[in-house]
Amino acid sequence: MQNLRHFYISGIFLLCLTACDTKQNQTDTKTEDANSAPVSTTECYSYVTDKDTIATQFTLANGNITGALQYKLFEKDKNTGSLTGQMHGDTLVAEYSFMSEGVQSVREVVFLKKDDNLIEGFGDIEEKDGKMVFKDKAALKFDSNTPMKKMECK
């Protein structure tokens, strides 16, 4: 009879252990799901002087960006278009698709993110597959004369 009681107590103990372990595994899975959810942020930057404006707003999710970019430079045509690309560390590399003088164009743009600024990169370009792209991204010069400052999105 005492052996039977030990048997029941052991069985109940094993059931409790199994139930506790199952609950722990479920908690771990939920934590992983919450941590692996894609994080999305929207950022806005602008450079404004008396006669010039450069502005962008984009959403960053899992290293990919989508948004808009606008150039309104004195005595030049206004360009407004879409931006799609990726963040590589502190560097944003994207295609800027825009309309200028009634012509749809696509060109590569590269911005360096430094503190709360986006600084545009400039360098030699060439046409590839109907798009203007940089010949050598490693040779780009980043012009800090027109830094876009981070601002609150409207």
List each model region and its residues:
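N-terminal glycine/threonine-rich, aromatic-flanked beta-hairpin/loop signature
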Residues: T59-Q86
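Beta-sheet ligand-binding and adhesion/scaffold domains
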Residues: T49, N64-T66, V93-K154
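Bacterial N-terminal signal peptides that target proteins for export
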Residues: M1-I9
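Sequence contexts marking disulfide-bonded cysteines in secreted/extracellular proteins
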Residues: D21, E43-Y45, E152-K154
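Short, low-complexity, disordered segments immediately C-terminal to signal peptides
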Residues: D21-V39
